[in-house]
Amino acid sequence: MITKLPPTSESNNSLSDELLEKINAYWRAANYLSVGQIYLLDNPLLKKPLSIKDIKPRLLGHWGTTPGLNFIYVHLNRIIKKFDLDMIYLIGPGHGGPGIVANTYLEGTYSEYYPHISQDAEGMQKLFKQFSFPGGIPSHVAPETPGSINEGGELGYSLSHAFGAAFNNPDLIVGCVIGDGEAETGPLATAWHSNKFLNPAIDGAVLPILHLNGYKIANPTILARISQEELKSLFVGYGYKPYFVEGSDPQLMHRLMAETLDMIIKEIQEIQTNARKNGIVKRPIWPMIILRTPKGWTGPKEVDGKKTENYWRSHQVPFSDMKEEHIKLLEEWLKSYRPEELFDETGKLFPILAELAPKGKRRMGDNFHANGGLLRKNLRLPDFRSYQLEVVTPGVVEAESTRIMGSFLRDVLKLNPHNFLVTGPDETASNRLTNLFEVTQRRWLAEYLPEDTDGGNLSLEGRVLEILSEHTCLGWLEGYILTGRHGFFSTYEAFAHIIDSMFNQHAKWLQTTLTIPWRAPIPSINILLSSHVWRQDHNGFSHQDPGFIDLVMNKKAAVVRVYLPPDSNTLLSVTDHCLRSLNYINVIVAGKQPALQYLSMEAAIKHCTAGIGIWEWASNDKGGEPDVVLACAGDIPTLEILAAVDILRQSIPTLKIRVINVVDLMTLQPKEEHPHGLSNTDFDEMFTTNKPIIFAYHGYPWLIHRLTYRRSNHSNIHVRGYKEEGTTTTPFDMVVLNEVDRFHLVGDVIDRVPKLGYLAAYTKQEMRHKLIEHKEYIHQFGEDMPSVKNWKWPYGKE
């Protein structure tokens, strides 16, 4: 299909015939290099007839999307030069990796980052061989690819990353290609609404380019099979102004794309000028492109008599059985790009074509924003000690820990007005972070109603961004952080699972960047999990799931951290530490409900610095040997352990108890497995080598066993945690259902301390009676017993 140019006076001004031919040649060069990466081991310039020895034994990669990506790249290069734009290129269909590698090679960036891939025939041969080859580079737009901040392995995140990159980056334009397969994913579908949060006065611009090539792996795409009228209505409904660039004839398509981009850039600049100079700040109708090109454009039209170009068969490798006729077909395909017109005898791109690329940091492969660590500025942080809660006696004062954390984050926002964002799925208020609204508001560029002034906290320039999509919130934050800024994401613990695989992708990205010297460290992603399992008694079973921690702990120690601060002062210390860190995903689990507070700020700092410690004030074994070790991790398990200690002290005063609290789960691992891990000597000194250990843990109990299985006293560790028992009930009944309550814990101690035996029979019977009383009470009154609800630590500091 060929779409004629619109009859505008500018049609002939965007591209002269000479420039059109150069752009087409540059595009041919990118396509040639892309095919070469997929197929060739040697003979990069086809100086001799192609033979089986020149071809890789395992053919890997994706051709179908690549020529379209190359087409877009060369046209973005043109407008970067014409308008002197600061622009980066995000690739949703990241399986088109050979195209981006090809273009960064053509512009010279690739050889600067990888000098052994030189701008000659030898370098080209290495470029071809390394692609999807052992010891080489991945098939996707991975961290190894200059200019990339979105690998596009798992689809769906390109557009939210693009908007995240544009927030607070007023001079940046983000060209974002969304594949028509990717457009079928949930995260991408929601991310279109990001335009309701982009403020043209203070943010950059995003240019979405929906690439319709018609097919996924072996299936048509939905958006390519609906009418243009329906497609246009869809994106007009999303709030965009779609421009259609459709066809298969390169000459017409180059002219149409150039004309369209010129109009769009002028439109973007007009929107920004109106907002920045004329003070017209409202939600604009941002332009976008719907680009329809054949899948596998310029590739073989048929292979073995079967349609290939403009069909799903071109998605990956159009043919891989390298029989004689296929070798001939590959040679014809490569020669169709006329490489002798593109590269000189040495294999270098002709200067007349090389001059089409932007220079220096204007090249998309070398743009600072695509290596955001180079732009990173350390946060200005207030002294977290200033927000401390006065704790004179442990376990007496109550406070909402996340509310105190919110005061600290409020002032972080205040001190960092241009490089710190808070995102979340409409849970900022629920998670007790409302103090943020003392210095900022929720970003909102959609419609306003009069009642919004009554507690709506909406603003055109707010730095709290909320949309009821965990994917979009985290995508914004990742894009913001990948371009060198800082941020914070809070969500309900159970629903963090929505971003499980998204977390995986970022963790893999971080892990890979650690091996790439030119990738500068970026700020950490900081995730608060609140409204957690033990205080979701009111919402019920669907809201009760602490398993996100398990997922995080599967990742390499080099890129993840998990913290379970038991009170507000430890939470402040942990938060300050996380905001200062680089190249991590930090997960903090903290409750929002009123809870007992245990440590002074001085004690909290020492405890958090170590990550684990004996609480002397809760123990009575100092100067001797404990009979039992009671360990805890998490605010509610800590409460229940301390309440169990109280019962044991009263009923069995001769029992020697050591209480250990864990803030940093990684300390439980051996030092050889994690840098925060305790040495075997330190672990044994703390936990003993032969005493029973009762461990009350916030999440699923087997994680503690997994972390400690190599410890000498592992056989004596008995873990209580969440075991998928829950409903709508009372807070204390939640721990009873999962046997993490004080009464079950006392029973565990009695069962596992050999010397107690018959001596503690009466105490154990009393615990059974208490559990019966508990059930009867909540069923009659609908709330927990006063003795439970009002319990406080009765022993002071000693």
From Swiss-Prot:
InterPro entries: Phosphoketolase, THDP-binding, Transketo_C/PFOR_II, Xul5P/Fru6P_PKetolase, Xul5P/Fru6P_PKetolase_C, Xul5P/Fru6P_PKetolase_CS, Xul5P/Fru6P_PKetolase_N, Xul5P/Fru6P_PKetolase_ThDP_BS. Keywords: Lyase, Thiamine pyrophosphate. It is an enzyme of class 4 (lyase). Its EC number is 4.1.2.-. One of its GO terms (biological process) is carbohydrate metabolic process. The keyword Iron-sulfur does not apply. CDD domains: SH3, TPP_PK. Its cofactor is thiamine diphosphate. GO terms for molecular function: aldehyde-lyase activity. Belongs to the XFP family. PANTHER family: PHOSPHOKETOLASE-RELATED (PTHR31273:SF0). This is Probable phosphoketolase. It comes from Protochlamydia amoebophila (strain UWE25).
